């Protein structure tokens, strides 16, 4: 398989990765005590606080995810960024003065001083679980998958189909919505959660064009179509599906990412983390703005004003509404003003890896300026990330482009 990256691309990618790690370790080389390790010696300037808060909250998968949600849902998703300002202001003027007055290193330390050690241990355990399950697992998954797909090249796309049953629950039809490509052997067919050995795919030039029935399949739900999955059949490795990453490569990617990130975090302390966060924030902002510029420069889009005008004329599929109806299935306006606000107060005011950046500031003033600057950068995301996803929605429609099946 040919890599999608050239030798120059590989040199830049891995060179910058290890350069950032090395620079972070070098920055944290003079740590002498706990305050240096946990709070960067309380010497961080406002721009370091801003860059580290932004970099800790926003990552490549965050930017890409917001583009995807903009494509699928629309501008209402921007409330995750806009209403974050309320949480940042709460941290800035209510929580932060208390934390800094008590001279705590971590929020666990604050709970220990305010209540007791049981509170400290309970909070620490909860935060470890949240960080691992909600943040690290998706980050490692997306990172390893992305790197492997770039390195191993085009391995094809999965087929997508749905099954229908008659009123008696007997399978009547399997509709192929997308035939995929690069199938070298017949994959197994799964309807719902069960593999069906008596179904076999019909292959033509590496694509699935139909399904053969060897006997009746019963016990299905007649009321709605059921998803059909195709397992295995890759032209290079029959054990995996087209577009998948080989399990060994996937695990190796996670291991490398864990070693690289763990090295500068564990050995460099908070100062190393802040330095690398600032670098990554600058790169993310520049890359996001560049992607937005390229997308909005396409003749089918023609800039923000033309996108707004086109969306106004797209009755029924508008993407630029800021508020959805109260019965919207995923993001009603009532949820924005209630549950989302509660989430922000927790995330920005009592979240260890956010608050610790502000605690490392050299003064209350520097901390506040840094927090407010991070909020400004957050307000850019709806336009260069979510807005780009909305523009991509209309661009894909005009060019009749296919959306990747795992998007």
Predicted segments, located by residue:
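Membrane-water interface regions at transmembrane-helix termini and the short interhelical loops
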Residues: 1, 69-71, 95-101, 109, ...
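Membrane-interface "cap" regions at the ends of multi-pass membrane proteins
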Residues: 1-63, 268, 366, 370
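Loop-to-helix junctions at membrane interfaces in multi-pass transport proteins
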Residues: 2-5, 42-44, 48, 65-79, ...
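Extracellular loop-to-transmembrane helix junctions
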Residues: 4-28, 44, 48, 68-104, ...
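Residue-level recognition of pore/gate-forming positions within transmembrane alpha-helices
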Residues: 17-20, 56-57, 84-88, 128, ...
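Membrane-embedded alpha-helical core segments of multi-pass
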Residues: 19, 87-94, 103-104, 264-268, ...
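Helix-loop-helix module between adjacent transmembrane segments
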Residues: 78-157, 236-257, 261-265, 339-347
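Conserved, function-critical positions that sit in or immediately flank catalytic
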Residues: 154-244
